[in-house]
Amino acid sequence: MPRLPRDCSSRIIGSRARQLVHYSFDVNHWEYHEYTGTDHGIDCVIELVENEEWHNKKIEGQIKGTRKPVCLKKGNVISFPIDVKTVNYGLGSNVAFVLFVVDVDNEKVYYLPLQD
């Protein structure tokens, strides 16, 4: 029997994390755009829609998925390792840049606006 490529858990976790971030935004007020292909630090752009009008207000996002987040302070805060280059990239953005960390097993999305 020929050997076939194997699927990897990181692809599954990443795919599920992107899906959970996408569906955490109300479609009546936000348009979600996923970036695929070469990863330069932006996984998605979320654009605000108010009163059925586009206002060019956007959030860029980096999405990280995990099955075992390190929870601090009764589960409201997590610790997650992140590369300094990712933080620097987000800080250099001219629009709001948010780091999304997703607990894919419990379907919980944590977020940190980097410019705050």
PLM segments and residue spans:
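Mixed-charge (Asp/Glu-Lys/Arg
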Residues: 1-40, 46-116
